Amino acid sequence: FQVSQGTVRKAIDELAAENLLIRRQGKGTFVPTHSEPKVRFRFLKLTPDDGHQPVSGSEIIDCQRLRAPAEIAQHLQLKTAATVVRIRRLLSFDGQPTIFDDIWLPGRVFRGVNEDTVRANDSPLYAWFEVEFGVSMVRADEAIRAVAAQAEAVQYLGVPAGRPLLQVDRVS
């Protein structure tokens, strides 16, 4: 490929800095899985001002197979009304409900995903997607906007209706 060793090292350093590669002293450099603590929340970087690393928790609310709404079909590059899987979960940090998560998956790729399999899974979802379905999430495009808390946020996050929240739309 006619690339200098220094250029390759610099590229590896940059990939390691972004947690796309992991270095293990005495063993080498590896592509991490989503089950490794350092990359478990690769696309979610929430750290309190004091730097404390909170204990995380995940509660599955439900999992359904549905026809893709137009907006979801467009994001996932599917035909309108294609089958999708929607997983709803609540993420907590130090016992505090923090994130109400809607995860949309192409139904054809994730055929074995249903409420029973999601609830039976005890590994991080992205790690499960890698191991069980051969789908690695290595990149994400995000759009963030301010929204007023609606009924589901009020119910699951325990915030007053209308409270300003951040909504993150991520395609990974």
Q: How does the language model describe each region?
A:
Residues T80-D94, L165-S172:
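A short beta-strand signature
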Residues C63-A68, R88-L90, V147, D169-V171:
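Generic short beta-strand segments
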Residues A140-V171:
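Extended hydrophobic
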